[in-house]
Amino acid sequence: MVSVEDITNAVNRYLELVATGTADEIAALYAEDATVEDPVGGGEVHIGRQAIHGFYKNIENIPRATELHTLRVAGHEAAFMFSITVGGDGGKMRIEPIDVMVFNSEGKITSMKAYWSPAYVTTLP
């Protein structure tokens, strides 16, 4: 049984790795048959750890930082709002999604959906 503390720790670890980790490290947080839809309604759903690895590989060499704004855990699920700032000296942008994750009994992410659109993207100087 996964606890509220386990899920809270997993979300914090996820945000830490999205900011500083590799695609391998982020993908390891997911169950083998997990799904990622980011953004929801954006077309492609990444199915399986290998596809999820490919998704996160896209940001691996880009400067980035994350900040958690709010987190709610209920049952085996977490919903959280955070911001991710990506880019470097050539320009930065901040995205403010709300993510919903479902966890299995081992604490692995089985589903992640990110709710955002261009309306939640800010160009930074």
Task: For each feature predicted by the language model, list its residue ranges.
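Short hydrophobic/aromatic segments of transmembrane alpha-helices and their interfaces
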Residues: V18, A34-V36, K92
